[in-house]
Amino acid sequence: EAGVVTEELEDCILNVAISPGIVSVSVHPYYNGGIAHALFYGLTCRKHIEKHHLHGEVVSYGTLVNLMVDQNMEKLKLAYDFNKEVGLPTCLADLELEKDDPLEDVLRITMENQELTHTPYPVDAKMIHEAILKLEDYRG
């Protein structure tokens, strides 16, 4: 807010950037992402998303979808409000997609991903698509 880069800020940024990388190479790939990461791989089959949006940006949207699938409205509100506040995606338009896009290619690739091998409950393309559509109408 003050426009000053402090040592504490640098430490925080390094922790945020490095910790997920350490975790991702320390656990079996089956336990490393769930819906948010599977959807990242699906969404990036659209070349404009892969070209114009960062990994964390797309995964942050996938996290919202994951929370909607989980029907965890309390955590969804927290994550949604955070995304809004810092300018991360909260809807398809933020990823340059239309609400009426059937996302068939996105959902197919999402479902083929190993990230969905071990989930706490069975996940299918219909669940993810319905969560995406519900997220389109969600306003926190």
Summary of predicted features, one role per range:
Residues 1-82:
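Active-site segments that bind and position negatively charged phosphate/pyrophosphate groups
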